[in-house]
Amino acid sequence: MDYESKYFKWLGYEETVRLQKEISEKIIKEDAFKNLRYVGGVDTSSIEDKIAGVIVVLEFNTLEVLEVSIEISQVNFPYIPGFLSFREGPIILKAWENLKIKPDLLIFDGQGIAHPRRLGIASHVGYVLDVPSIGCAKKILVGVYKEPDKKRGSFEYIYIDNEIVGAVVRTKDNVKPVFVSLGHKISLSTSIEIILKTSTKYRLPEPVRLAHIYSKKALNFEIKGELL
């Protein structure tokens, strides 16, 4: 199937919004998986007209890195807030296709349903791939919340019009929180548990932290011929 033309093609503002709303109604907001052996971290980086998409596959219990898939291509879509998945989704799909080990769950550096139309990149790509997914962002896109306590594991819910769409989660004592929302085929409570389990030494969960590092290095090497 040509996923890019079906799910990530710009159709004009109104039609693209309609597509987002249509897909968002199909998002599964409960745990729809049994075993969790492999987890994937997903991130992209862009410089000038190049974009790198990375998926890092780790063993869930040990967080041992098993595989890294990197794809680099031309940027074919401008940066438009609320439509990030149309810019980054296609390169992530290419990275997914090249994986020998397919993760049981993906953690994205970005939003899940904590999005104006409840379809951030974690939800959009998770739905297209039919894979459980979580959004874990460094900044909030939309919604209101109270600051959680300073202790690791503390969290407060994110609300949009009195609807719970995510949680602000403290992954380290006295460090800025992350913004967690379910992506697809997972509950918010399980999403929070997994983010805390995979956040060991740093603010960001290890799969996402590593994906970010690899995407930056890959793009720097592609453009400048040197590693960071």
Swiss-Prot record:
Annotated residues that bind Mg(2+) are located at D43, D109
Record's Gene Ontology CC terms?
cytoplasm
For this protein, what reaction is catalysed? Endonucleolytic cleavage at apurinic or apyrimidinic sites to products with a 5'-phosphate
Keywords per UniProt:
Cytoplasm, DNA damage, DNA repair, Endonuclease, Hydrolase, Magnesium, Metal-binding, Nuclease
Subcellular localization(s) per the UniProt record: Cytoplasm
Q: Where is this site: Interaction with target DNA?
A: Y79
Statement: the UniProt record of this protein carries the keyword Electron transport: no
Q: Report the domain of life of the source organism.
A: Bacteria
Look up the record and name the cofactor or cofactors this protein needs. Answer: Mg(2+)
What GO biological process terms does the UniProt entry carry, in alphabetical order? DNA repair
- Record-linked CDD domains: Endonuclease_V
Where mainly located? cytoplasm
Report the EC number(s), separated by commas if there are several. Answer: 3.1.21.7
What is a GO molecular function of this protein?
A: deoxyribonuclease V activity
Q: Which family does it belong to?
A: Belongs to the endonuclease V family.
Question: NCBIfam families per the record?
Answer: PRK11617.1
**Its biological purpose:** DNA repair enzyme involved in the repair of deaminated bases. Selectively cleaves double-stranded DNA at the second phosphodiester bond 3' to a deoxyinosine leaving behind the intact lesion on the nicked DNA.
Q: What protein does this entry describe?
A: Endonuclease V
